[in-house]
A protein has these predicted regions:
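Alpha-helical structural modules in large enzymes and assemblies
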Residues: 1-440
Length: 440
């Protein structure tokens, strides 16, 4: 069945005029490095995304080994590198090395392939920089959580205490650097259970109890919970299927504009956009000025980091987003033939209504027969992945299928059946059997 599913997906990729890939590598429960690859292609006038393959890698996951596995699959399955127009990875050196990284090696044989640094990883990197004061509070908050969660006895005792105090929650969340959304959820839960945590740490004579009795510390903790909650919302909006460069840029641009607005309001002493912090300031009677400088420094740092990692959207492709209204400078990247076709397309009011009614990728595929040149040019921009979200979902499935009880499992076929949207053609498989199995 797995072979049949693979054949369906590979055949669609072979027939697609263009395609793009996203890939990532991770280590499974048996300490074996696994390379995960997803593909985006065109089939029946629609863009499809599907699992391409997952293979184990040698002990050293170098760029050469990753490229070897990737290229070997392309050659064995008859896929054409010349049709690959996008590759999305994280920013690891093995992927992005200037001279011998994976991306460089792929672009040597697929010069049309555009590299996209996973936008979710970029967002996570941009959010890491913080003033020293906030870093200290974050580290201490993680120690508080780990003091309770690292020992089963402490966890049970804390749960009993929360139950006796009628708390909404009875457990803290364990912080993990690996998971994107971990930090914000941990801090939010800690703020919600701060009274219970203070009482518990006091009862076990932990030196960390002093932090939860410090009003300034609590205020900065509340701010961190609020700002990471907002960053988590951005992170979540960047996840999902069928995203393209324009939707991703819109989400990031919206967040950057919010940062500008928050900076201005904090400068005026207003903290209303940070409800947890505002609640702490109200309960403790602390003036906003007590945390104003730290928050301003952090927000300014976030603005600078987002500007560095994302930059400004190039205007040359605005005609793809809206061929009926775009800056005149966007015409500079078009040939005469493409500009004439775009002029004709933009004069068709029926097509204007069609753009409103369907996703942008379907719109450009729907006009392929009438305007093949601009349609192809638009799809080359829209086909690349903007994140490795699907690979991360695949690794979650990998941990579910290949666990400590099945650590020697050869997981490739199981993953394909679990992750692929293609269904095994059962009737075709049964008909192809020369000798059916008889019942015993």
């Amino acid at each position: 069945m797995a072979y049949d599913v693979k054949e369906q997906v590979v055949n669609c990729v072979r027939q697609s005029p263009i395609h793009a890939i996203q890939l990532d590598e991770s280590t499974d429960v048996a300490h074996c490095a696994q390379l995960m690859v997803y593909v985006r292609f065109i089939n029946e006038q629609r863009v499809h995304e599907d699992f391409l393959f997952c293979v184990p890698l040698p002990a050293r996951t170098t760029a050469d080994e990753i490229f070897k596995a990737l290229n070997e699959f392309y050659q064995n399955e008859g896929l054409e590198w010349s049709r690959c127009y996008g590759i999305c990875t994280d920013g690891a050196r093995a992927m992005t090395g200037r001279h011998s990284g994976l991306v460089k090696q792929v672009q040597t044989i697929a010069p049309a392939a555009v590299w996209n640094h996973c936008i979710i990883h970029r967002q996570a990197l941009a959010a890491k920089t913080m003033p020293k004061e906030l870093c200290v509070v974050l580290d201490e908050a993680v120690k508080v959580v780990n003091t309770i969660k690292s020992r089963a006895l402490n966890t049970r005792l804390f749960s009993i205490l929360c139950d006796e105090m009628g708390a909404r929650f009875k457990q803290l969340l364990l912080h993990s650097e690996v998971r994107w959304l971990s930090r914000g959820k941990v801090l939010t839960r800690l703020c919600e259970l701060q009274d219970e945590v203070l009482l518990f740490l006091t009862e076990i004579n932990s030196p960390l109890a002093k932090h939860l009795a410090d009003m300034n510390w609590l205020a900065m903790l509340a701010y961190l919970a609020d700002i990471f909650d907002k960053i988590n919302s951005l992170n979540t909006s960047l996840q999902g299927k069928e995203g393209h460069v324009f939707t991703a840029h819109d989400q990031v641009t919206g967040f950057r504009r919010k940062l500008d607005a928050w900076c201005a309001r904090v400068g005026r002493g207003s903290m209303e956009m940070f409800p947890t912090l505002e609640d702490v300031l109200e309960k403790t009677a602390l003036p906003p000025s007590s945390v104003q400088l730290v928050i301003t420094a952090h927000l300014n740092g976030l603005r600078d980091q987002f500007a560095e990692y994302f930059g400004e959207e190039p205007l040359g492709n605005q005609w793809i987003r809206n061929p009926f209204s775009f800056p005149a400078t966007a015409r500079d990247a078009l040939s005469l033939q493409e500009e004439e076709a775009l002029a004709e397309l933009s004069s068709n009011l029926d097509l204007k209504q069609r753009l409103v009614e369907m996703p942008i990728t379907r719109f450009w595929l729907s006009v392929e027969s009438e305007f093949p040149h601009v349609s192809a040019k638009a799809m080359r921009v829209l086909i690349p992945f903007t994140s490795t979200y699907l690979c991360e979902c695949g690794f979650s499935a990998l941990t579910l299928i290949k666990n400590k009880y099945r650590s020697r499992l050869q997981v490739q076929d199981d993953l394909r059946l679990f992750l692929s949207s293609a269904q095994p053609r059962i009737e075709h498989l049964c008909a192809s059997k020369v000798r059916p199995h008889c019942s015993h």
